[in-house]
């Protein structure tokens, strides 16, 4: 006899990013633990899921066993955007088990829960805090076996009632000898750590039966909207990017500087990533602004994450107009203690929302400083993952990187990430006849011919102007070029 495979329906939690790390949602009728230290966000997560899932056809019961009345808890939870007062006492009902717990009689506690569940027939049941049940049982003198039997009976009853259940508790370590961990189908562990003045919240799905969850710790943030989980960007096979990066007929995008497009071999190939590296004030942000402005002129949309100054400053009025009209999306980088996964998620969301073809990250140096200290340690690996994820969107990405002008050390990124990008443009300062001049060159364009010239360039009110290439000089990359004997200064042609 052939036994058909049982299909598990997955509930969409309503918590941004959580369904992704759960592997597609929460298994219906599962018996789950939401664990963590005090203040880690357990009750907020439970309420956000409850209000997101509860409907008239799928009602929820929330049992509180805390010493404080539900009204006090609701006073704080209703400050969040997800709180829906119209659902209270209709699709969402609260019950206080404090009196039942005080006796330490688990039979009475189970009887009370059973009676309310039978009366209201909920699809969702929450018990907060379940650790209070454990402490009350121990203080009441009952045996550890009694607690284990209570948990097993509760799990069996919830399954027979076809209710998806959540036990919320203050647990500090997964290896505690606690019977509830064995019975649970799923465990969502919330953590928070403090390093210097930085507070970082992380979530881990330590257990979820029947689900291929995303392993590891995932950062999340609590705002007025509630909890937002930032799953690591997924490197899917399907993307809008050009799948054949070696194709000789690549579609090209203009950077907004015609001469620089020529140096690139006709523009930047669509879907490529470009690193613009140079010292402070060399014109990196201006080039980034020209890239976005040119896209706007051609009817394209873009996204910018500016970490050093507001996007509408130093990039001209055209950028401000594009932002105000909604054709350029701006990533808010003012939040403290960000993670690379958070910024990547915000970028990808904006790219999909606007169907953006151009993305600017200005700059990687500011990007690193915006991160919580714990995330700076693996910045290179996280950045590599983010660049790969952005490539799957099909957008063309321009990143800037500030370098110290060390002329004895030719580097294009302080993070050793230059190899991750498809193309590199370098900007440098040189001294000629006691004057500071700017030069630029295209270092690489993957699978494409490009100019090898070092070209002078100026910056005026209209942006970047590429001048002639430097001929008759030696030691340009050393910062102090010397003119070959008998050759005049070619830059004098523009004087």
Where are the model-predicted features located?
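Conserved P-loop NTPase
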Residues: 2-4, 8-9, 111, 118-120, ...
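Pre-Walker A adenine-sensing motif
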Residues: 14-25, 256-267
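Scaffold/interface architecture of coatomer-like assemblies
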Residues: 23, 31, 36-38, 45, ...
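Short glycine-/polar-rich loops that comprise or flank the Walker A/P-loop
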Residues: 29, 56-59, 88-92, 161-163, ...
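P-loop NTPase motor core
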Residues: 32, 102, 107-183, 187, ...
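Conserved P-loop
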Residues: 37-101, 269-273, 279-342
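Short beta-alpha junctions and helix-cap segments that line functional grooves
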Residues: 49, 170, 174-178, 189-192, ...
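Conserved nucleotide-binding/hydrolysis micro-motifs of P-loop NTPases
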Residues: 66-71, 98-103, 130-133, 165, ...
């Amino acid at each position: 006899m052939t036994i058909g495979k049982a299909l598990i329906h997955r509930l969409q939690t309503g918590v941004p990013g959580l369904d992704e790390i759960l592997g597609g949602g929460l298994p219906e009728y599962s018996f789950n633990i939401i664990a963590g230290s005090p203040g880690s966000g357990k009750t907020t997560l439970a309420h956000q899921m409850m209000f997101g899932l509860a409907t008239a056809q799928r009602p929820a019961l929330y049992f509180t066993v805390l010493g404080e009345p539900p009204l006090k808890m609701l006073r704080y939870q209703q400050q969040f955007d997800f709180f829906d007062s119209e659902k209270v006492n209709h699709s969402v009902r609260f019950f206080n088990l404090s009196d039942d717990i005080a006796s330490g009689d688990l039979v009475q506690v189970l009887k009370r829960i059973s009676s309310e569940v039978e009366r209201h027939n909920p699809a969702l049941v929450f018990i907060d805090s379940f650790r209070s049940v454990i402490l009350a049982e121990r203080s009441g003198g009952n045996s550890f076996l009694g607690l284990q039997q209570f948990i097993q009976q509760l799990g069996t009853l919830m399954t027979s009632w076809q209710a998806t259940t959540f036990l919320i508790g203050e647990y500090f370590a997964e290896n505690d000898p606690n019977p509830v961990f064995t019975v649970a189908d799923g465990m969502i562990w919330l953590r928070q750590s403090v390093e210097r003045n930085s507070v970082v919240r992380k979530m881990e799905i330590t257990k979820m039966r029947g689900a291929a969850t995303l392993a590891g710790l995932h950062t999340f943030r609590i705002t007025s909207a509630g909890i937002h989980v930032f799953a690591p960007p997924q490197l899917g096979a399907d993307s809008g990017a050009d799948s054949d990066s070696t194709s000789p007929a690549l579609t090209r995008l203009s950077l907004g500087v015609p001469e620089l497009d020529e140096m690139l071999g006709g523009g930047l190939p669509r879907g490529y990533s470009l690193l613009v590296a140079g010292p402070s004030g060399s014109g990196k942000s201006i080039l980034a602004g020209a890239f976005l402005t040119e896209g706007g002129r051609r009817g394209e949309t873009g996204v910018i994450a500016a970490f050093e100054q507001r996007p509408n400053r130093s990039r001209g009025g055209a950028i401000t107009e594009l932002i105000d009209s909604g054709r350029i999306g701006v990533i808010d980088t003012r939040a403290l203690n960000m993670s690379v996964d958070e910024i990547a998620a915000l970028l990808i969301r904006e790219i999909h929302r606007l169907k953006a073809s151009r993305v600017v990250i200005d700059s990687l140096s500011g990007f690193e400083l915006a991160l919580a200290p714990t995330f700076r340690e693996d910045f290179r690996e996280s950045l590599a993952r983010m660049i790969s994820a952005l490539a799957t969107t099909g957008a063309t990405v321009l990143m800037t990187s500030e370098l110290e002008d060390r002329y004895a050390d030719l580097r294009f990124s302080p993070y050793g990430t230059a190899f991750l990008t498809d193309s590199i443009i370098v900007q440098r300062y040189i001294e000629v006849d006691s004057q500071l001049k700017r030069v630029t060159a295209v270092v690489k364009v993957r699978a494409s011919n490009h100019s090898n010239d070092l070209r002078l360039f100026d910056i005026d009110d209209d942006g970047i102007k590429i001048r002639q290439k430097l001929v008759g000089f030696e030691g340009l990359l050393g910062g102090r070029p010397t003119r070959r004997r008998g050759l005049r200064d070619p830059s004098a042609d523009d004087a």
